[in-house]
Amino acid sequence: MIDYIKGNLVAVEPAYLVVEANGIGFQIYCANPYRFINDLNREVVVPTHHYVREDSQRLFGFTTRTERLLFEKLLNVSGIGPKGALAILASGEPEDIIHAIEQEDEALLVRFPGVGKKTARQIILDLKGKLDDMAPMLEPAAGADKQQKNPQLEDALEALRALGYVEKELKKVEKQLKAETLETDEYIRRALALMLKRP
């Protein structure tokens, strides 16, 4: 088991990071590699999960150990593989996902990519009551950008502020926007549509 990779972050790609350690470039797949963009060409410490199958091996990386543990628990759910688990992590914060599972909030879970009602029920069935060990593990990994986890959303919110929208209005739609993975212009259009629907 490779617990973590410590080295120089030499590339950030849409699906993975490249971290050079001891002259070797490790390709590390992440839910959102751009969380590390501010640490390009700096030393990072990335918690990892070494996924091994007969025909392939991959390293998956995370911003926190909590995120990694949640990924590993999601892999134990029938019907969820590494791509599905990463898609869920890319679309929500670990604490929000854990809360949805513990509260049996199927409506929130089905918002995640690839999660239908059947899979949402399976996640709740398999994981409810088994996530208590994750609560104390919420500190970010060294090198992870905690403040700007979603640059596209932050840019969209800043643009909306420039248009004259106040924090109270933005807070009402921000949580829903966080559950989606969009480009900046798409976040702006989505936010405007949501605010127009509100009384």
Swiss-Prot record:
Keyword DNA damage set for record: yes
Pfam families: HHH_5, RuvA_C, RuvA_N
Record keywords: Cytoplasm, DNA damage, DNA recombination, DNA repair, DNA-binding
Location of region: Flexible linker: 143-153
Region (Domain I) residue spans: 1-63
Region named Domain III: 153-199
Signal peptide per UniProt: none
GO biological process: DNA recombination; DNA repair
Example of a GO cellular component annotation carried by this entry: Holliday junction helicase complex
InterPro entries the record matches: DNA_helicase_Holl-junc_RuvA_I, Hlx-hairpin-Hlx_DNA-bd_motif, NA-bd_OB-fold, RuvA, RuvA_2-like, RuvA_C, RuvA_C_sf
Keyword Iron found: no
One MF term in the entry's GO annotations: ATP binding
Region: Domain II, residue numbers: 64-142
Subcellular localization: Cytoplasm
Function: The RuvA-RuvB-RuvC complex processes Holliday junction (HJ) DNA during genetic recombination and DNA repair, while the RuvA-RuvB complex plays an important role in the rescue of blocked DNA replication forks via replication fork reversal (RFR). RuvA specifically binds to HJ cruciform DNA, conferring on it an open structure. The RuvB hexamer acts as an ATP-dependent pump, pulling dsDNA into and through the RuvAB complex. HJ branch migration allows RuvC to scan DNA until it finds its consensus sequence, where it cleaves and resolves the cruciform DNA.
Comment, domains: Has three domains with a flexible linker between the domains II and III and assumes an 'L' shape. Domain III is highly mobile and contacts RuvB.
NCBIfam families from the UniProt entry: ruvA
Quaternary state and interactors: Homotetramer. Forms an RuvA(8)-RuvB(12)-Holliday junction (HJ) complex. HJ DNA is sandwiched between 2 RuvA tetramers; dsDNA enters through RuvA and exits via RuvB. An RuvB hexamer assembles on each DNA strand where it exits the tetramer. Each RuvB hexamer is contacted by two RuvA subunits (via domain III) on 2 adjacent RuvB subunits; this complex drives branch migration. In the full resolvosome a probable DNA-RuvA(4)-RuvB(12)-RuvC(2) complex forms which resolves the HJ.
Family: Belongs to the RuvA family.
Name this protein carries in UniProt: Holliday junction branch migration complex subunit RuvA
Organism of provenance: Shouchella clausii (strain KSM-K16) (Alkalihalobacillus clausii)
